[in-house]
Every structure is written in C-alpha cells, then in structure tokens.
Amino acid sequence: MSGVNDIRSAFLNYFAANGHEIVPSSPLVPRNDPTLMFTNAGMVQFKNVFTGVEKRPYQRATTSQKCVRAGGKHNDLDNVGYTARHHTFFEMLGNFSFGDYFKDRAIELAWKLVTEEFGLPKDKLIATVYIDDDEAFGLWKKIAGLPDSRIIRIAGADNFWQMGDTGPCGPCSEIFYDHGDKIPGGPPGSPDEDGDRFVEIWNLVFMQYEKLPDGSRLNLPKPSIDTGAGLERVAAVLQGKHDNYDIDLFVALIRAAADLTGADPHGPMKASLRVIADHLRATSFLIADGVLPSNEGRGYVLRRIMRRAMRHAQLLGAKEPLMWRLVGVLVREMGEAFPELQRARPLIEETLRLEETRFRKTLERGLSILDEKSASLKKGDMFDGETAFTLYDTYGFPLDLTQDALRARGIGVDIASFTDAMEQQKAKARASWSGSGEAATETIWFPLREKLGATEFLGYETEIAEGAVAALVKDGKEADSLKAGESGAIVLNQTPFYGESGGQVGDTGILTGDGVRVRVTDTQKKAGDLFVHLGTVEQGTLTPGMALALEVDRARRGAIRANHSATHLLHEALRQVLGDHIAQRGSLVAPERLRFDFVHNKPISADELRRIEDIANDVVLENGEVTTRLMAVDDAREAGARALFGEKYGDEVRVVSMGSTGRQGAASNALGWSVELCGGTHVKRTGDIGLISVTGESAVASGVRRIEALTGHHARHHANDAIQLAKTAAGELRTTLDDMPPRITSLMEERKKLERELSEARKKLAMGGGAASASSGAAGVRDVGGIKLMARSVEGIEIKDLKNLADQGKKQLGSGVVALVATSGDGKASIVVGVTPDLVTRFSAVDLVRKASEVLGGKGGGGKPDMAQAGGPDGAKAGAALDAIAAAMGG
C-alpha cells in the first residue's frame, strides 16, 4: 500500500467504509468562489455547504482534491525545487462532516487510519491543539493515549482557522510525524520548528463558531469537520522518505526527465529536475481543466509555471521542447485516478510543445541581456529593477525567471524599483486611455445608470412592447431632443430589444410615437445593464418622457434565436467528438451566421466536422423543448451547467437546456443534453432551428479554434447552392454526381502525367537549343573572349530544374559559363548562372547573375561562385539580360 495510488485509494475507501460519500475532485478553476484564482484546499467545493447556502444529499464526504498554489496569497512557486515539501500542484486528502460528527469522532477516525490502516508507530506521532482547546487536548489523551508531552498547545493563527473576516471558524488540531534525530529541526511551537524532523501530515479543523462583524463568536448549532492531509507528505512518511521528491510518483517523473536530458537525478542539477517534475503536474492539470497560457489572469500564472520549467529544461541542456514528451509518464502515473488527464492528453502535449517552441527564442534573448546587464554584479548585490522591468515589458521575460536565474549567483532583484516602473507604465496607459474620444464618450453611461437604474428587459417574453424615453444621448452628451435626420442613442425605461452581450448581436427594429418614427440599427448594453438603442429619427422630434411603441425586427430576431441555440448544440457536439477539454473562448451570434471559438490545439478533420454536424442535427430533428430555468448561480454550476470562462454572473442566472436526457453524454442531473448558463434568446423547440450546416473551421489564436455555421433558410440556401454547383461541375465533366469523385481523381492523375511530360519536353528543348540571346549562335553557345558562354531563354521551368539544367550545361561545355533564364506565365523571370570550376577565379556566378537581375528589374541575387540565382519582374527582357552577362564577361 506504499505507492501513491494505493495510499489515495486506501484513504478514500477507509472513509467510505465509515459512512462517507466519495466525492470527485472539483476542477482547479473554482466553480463558486470568484475570490480564488485556483482551488487550493479540499474544502473549497464544500464552502457553501459549510455556510448553509447549499444542501447535499450526504452529511459526510471524503475527497482527494487537486490543488494549485502558484498565485496570489498562496504562492509556493519560487520555493519549488529547492525545498523538500513545496509544490505548485498537490493533492489534498480530506474527510468532511456537515453537522454530523465532531471532534471525538474526527480524532478517532484520523488516529485509527494513521496507526491501524497506515501502520505508523504511535511513538512517532505527536498532536497539536489550539492553546485553549482543552476538549481536543483531553480527547487526544483519551482516544490516542498520547501523553501530555506529545500533545502541544499552539497559540496564534496556525492552529485557529477561519473562512474570512466573518463566518464559520474554529480551532485546529494537527498530527505530526517525527523522522528522528538524524534530521535537524524541533517540534511544533519550538524556536527551530521550521526544520524537517517533525512534518505535519494531517490538519483537523473543528468548525464550532461563527465569527460576527464585531469580532465576537457564537457557537454554531451544528459544528462541522474539515480535514486536510497532503498526499505527497503522507506518501513520503509511509515510504520512509523525509523528502516528497523521493516518493514513487516523483521518482518516475524525475527519472523520465533525466533520461531525456542525460542529467544525474542525484547530481548538482537535481533541483532543475524537481522543478520540471512538479511543474509538469501543475501545467497538465490546469490545461486539462480548461486553462490555456495567456498574458492575464489564470492563463498568465500557467504561462509563468510553464516557462519556469522550460528555463530549467534549458539549464539541463535540452535542445528541443521537453515538457510535452513527459506527459505520457504523468498520464501513466495519475491517469487512472484522474481520467481528465487521459482525455486531454493531446491538448496538453500540443499546448506544451507550442509554448516551449515559442518561448525558446524569448529565453535565449532574455538570458543574453540578463548576462550582459549583470556581468559586473557579485554575490549579495541587487539587480536593477528597472532593467528587470524592461526585460519583462519589452522582451516578455517574466520577473520570476529573472529572479530564478540570478538566484544561483546569490544576486537579488530590486523589487521596489521594478514595481515603480510597472506603476509608471500603468499610469501612462491610463492617461492615454482617458484622453481618447472613445473614453470620453463612454463616461456618459455610468452617471446615467446611477440616475435611471437598470433597464427592464422584456425580450424573453415578447418582441412588441410599450416604453417611455428615459434619456437621449448625442455626441457623448445628454440631449433635449433628436430631430428628423439626426442619429443618437435612446435609453428607455423598459425594452424588448436585446442588448449585445454574450456573443449575441443587438436587436434592430422600429420605435413609433405621436408623429415620431425611429429606426433602431443596434442595441448595446452599457454600464452593466443599461440598454442603449442606437438609431436615426426618420420622422418627427423625439424628446425625453415621450411614450413609444417598441417593435423588434421579428424575422431577424428569429434567425438570431436559431443561431444562438445552434451554438449551444455545436458546443456539446464538439465536446462529445473532440473531448471534455473543449471550453468556449468566444462566439458571434448574428442573424445570418454564427461562429464559436473554443479550446483545441489542432485542426478538426473532415470526418470529425461531419460527426459534429450530424450530432447537432440529430438534436434538431428530435424537436425537443428548449427549457429555461432561473437558478442560483451555485446551484446551476453544481448541476453541471456550462459557463463561459471569465464571464461574470449574478446571484441568479438563466439556465438553458435542450436535447433529451437519454442522449449520449446527457447531464447526469437530468436537466438536458446541453445545459448552459446563458442570458441570450433561444428557440422554443430545437426543430425551430431547421438545419445546421457547418461551413468552416480555422485557427484564431494559439490553442484556439473557430467553427462557423449557418442555420435555417441560410443553411438550406447554402446546401442548395453547393448541390447546384456540384451538378454544374458534373455536367462539365460529363459524369454523374456519384461518379464525379473518381472522375476528378482520374483527371488529376492524367494532368500530373501530362505536366511531367511537358516538363521533360521543355528541359530537352532547353538543352537542345532554346531561344538564345540576339548575338548567340544557333545552339545558344558563343565565344566570349575565348570563353564558351551557353546563354538560353526557356519557358515554364522551375528554378530547381534550372539549376539541374545549368549543371548539365556545364558538363556539356567542359569549360565555360552557363546562363539560363526561365519566364513564367505572369511575365516574371528566374535566372541561373553556372561557372565551371576552372573559371571561378576569373568569373563569379554571383556577380554575373546580379548584372542580369538588374536588367530584369530585380534586386540582386545570391549563391556561390560556381552557381548563383536571381529573378526579376520583367521577363520580356530575358534576351537583354543574357547579353548583359556576355558584356560583363568582356564580350
């Protein structure tokens, strides 16, 4: 049971046998906590359960939670590789009680697991309790039989946990393992507690109070338990190691990296191998959970981790991208426990390979500048922060890499001056933005939103309504009126017009009132939820307070609805065909077309596109009801509703479901086949979409693909046009539609054969006496000052073939110069000049070809003294170019 996978299973199975629900790890991107960059503890997914906001069908749970600590307050990045127990990625084993058992049972369960199931010697274990937690102190004596000397009271925050400034909180109790006096360090609470002898392997949190805003505490009516045990630490103890990087999992990853680089796992570069092993886990799991490298937010933290590992790969002498080649080893070690690794393996490998390929140039340039700027520094000196910022800002060289590179030399970085330079740049950016006309125009909407409040949106239920003009805006300022012929922005108290958001374009339509008619050309959302109608007054004068009839262009809205619903179906179909790593990165929902951007690192094959289209159309043909529910955002996410990464949602969200629950891949909560958080407008039944036709697929950014499609009559017209085009082509080929593919294949093969024959004929013609210069002999060979010059002009021969012909010409002449000009159908010319070996000291092919290039309108040429090439746009002067070569030879 000493392997990492065995230990994980033993922990979960032990608590399952004791009435706990085994709950899968939540993603590294927190679903219900916008304050967290990454999931960093086992209790994160249960936060709302502990606070009473959410109810679960169980009162006891156990998990092995994926965690990342590499950004914000919890940031272990700089220490990774240099200490025994710091990691960017780790697993947190835990058991939880939601108002069920409390201290006595928690201590009993933990003690039995570590001593009976794991078999740790009791005399190697000590416990800590909060300084005034007499109850826990007594329980450790009673249940574990620990003497007073091995129960240590600890004051301060280390042994008292709280969720925030207010809310659930309580004392902690920790279990420590004693590695023995061969390892330096003292027990917890002692002056030398930071040594490695005593290692915390489990923390039990007793949530028994609620902290109030005034700082006072009340007893919770139902106290709860939250525990956390780092799997890597537990494994080290059970495997007889005092260093986490010596456990079986890390040994496998480190050995694989060492095999690929030739590094000694126990040599002077072992820290670099450890960095690579640790960072491989963090990057792979983050990518599997939908995070991609970028220059902001979670993507930037991922990029920093990746680049730090890549820098250490470079230190190990890796000449080619390394990280992606290690993913298979990680999947072998952890893929059974975390199937998402296996599903996302192609995406992980391709993302790592591309990122490392791009970063190598940045790394080489940055390290070169860093070496130059720090050459005069010695141990203990500080590297200039402004220069560090220039490396970051101009060359894309992250600060932590600068620090890491200088660390080995004992040189620090002046963080204060780095921060000052960063703030100065931000100030310049803000000044530039605030001085723009766009910024001045946009500022009008915030005070209007404060004054008028949110616009009430009626468009989910109707496309015709009545409303009153709340405000008019023209040229960035409030206006008293808009007259006939004038354009501006109209804010209404309520509207059926959808404001552009979530990828869906804004509505258009007509506003009419007493002698007034306004054509709305777009609707936008400003300052959050202020709907702004952009349009032109066609008749009358529009003034604030005027009552209007509001009518959305219903045909256009209907097409938009179909495209938006089709986007949802394509999203789910993409996931089924390509994998669970598919995550939305953007979309456009317009009346005539749709596009959907998503995470994927390689082109989609024609077969995959057809399967995606077929799956989506199968749901259309079901003609099932499209249901919309209003739900609490946390409930919606817990129910499996998909959300757009980075999108901000309110406390209550609309959940759009479509497709029967019996379909493959349907949500387990029975809400539907496709379930998404969405504020857009949708069809009532999937059959209203009519037809989905995928028209294209392309790349839009690194690791992001785009799929484009049509629906309804646009899709029908597209299909009809394609069929008619195919029929026309079949008619031209004198065949049927069914026989057209083999007919085209046959014609293409015949064409290739004819092209080969034509090429050979041209070559023979060229060497047998193609068109010569005006002063050449019949065979294109003449005497220039006693030197033979073969000068010929030919058509339709490629440059590579010209070189071969020039070599043949040199052999024919024995001694001499060969000049061949080939003209193409667009009038351009290519020229090759060859000089036999005995003449290269007298004539340079490079010099001669450049003389010809000038005549052809080109810009020089290049090559070697015995063979050079050039070109030019004016092929009509081929003969003159050959004469220029003869003149340069002295003829």
From Swiss-Prot:
Domain of life where this protein originates: Bacteria
Compartments reported by the entry: Cytoplasm
Enzyme class: ligase
Example GO BP: alanyl-tRNA aminoacylation
Cofactor binding notes: Binds 1 zinc ion per subunit.
Keywords: Aminoacyl-tRNA synthetase, ATP-binding, Cytoplasm, Ligase, Metal-binding, Nucleotide-binding, Protein biosynthesis, RNA-binding, tRNA-binding, Zinc
Entry-linked PROSITE patterns: AA_TRNA_LIGASE_II_ALA
UniProt-listed Pfam families: DHHA1, tRNA-synt_2c, tRNA_SAD
Cofactor: Zn(2+)
Chain positions recorded as Zn(2+) binding sites: H564, H568, C678, H682
Chief place where the protein resides: cytoplasm
A GO-annotated cellular component: cytosol
InterPro entries tied to this protein: aa-tRNA-synth_II/BPL/LPL, Ala-tRNA-lgiase_IIc, Ala-tRNA-ligase_IIc_anticod-bd, Ala-tRNA-synth_IIc_core, Ala-tRNA-synth_IIc_N, Ala-tRNA_ligase, Ala_tRNA_ligase_euk/bac, DHHA1_dom
Catalyzed reaction equations: tRNA(Ala) + L-alanine + ATP = L-alanyl-tRNA(Ala) + AMP + diphosphate
E.C. number(s) listed in UniProt: 6.1.1.7
GO molecular function, one term: zinc ion binding
Gene3D superfamilies listed in its UniProt record: 2.40.30.130, 3.10.310.40, 3.30.54.20, 6.10.250.550, Bira Bifunctional Protein, Domain 2 (3.30.930.10), Threonyl-trna Synthetase, Chain A, domain 2 (3.30.980.10)
UniProt-listed HAMAP family: Ala_tRNA_synth_B (MF_00036_B)
Function: Catalyzes the attachment of alanine to tRNA(Ala) in a two-step reaction: alanine is first activated by ATP to form Ala-AMP and then transferred to the acceptor end of tRNA(Ala). Also edits incorrectly charged Ser-tRNA(Ala) and Gly-tRNA(Ala) via its editing domain.
Protein family membership: Belongs to the class-II aminoacyl-tRNA synthetase family.
Comment field on protein domains: Consists of three domains; the N-terminal catalytic domain, the editing domain and the C-terminal C-Ala domain. The editing domain removes incorrectly charged amino acids, while the C-Ala domain, along with tRNA(Ala), serves as a bridge to cooperatively bring together the editing and aminoacylation centers thus stimulating deacylation of misacylated tRNAs.
Name of the protein in question: Alanine--tRNA ligase
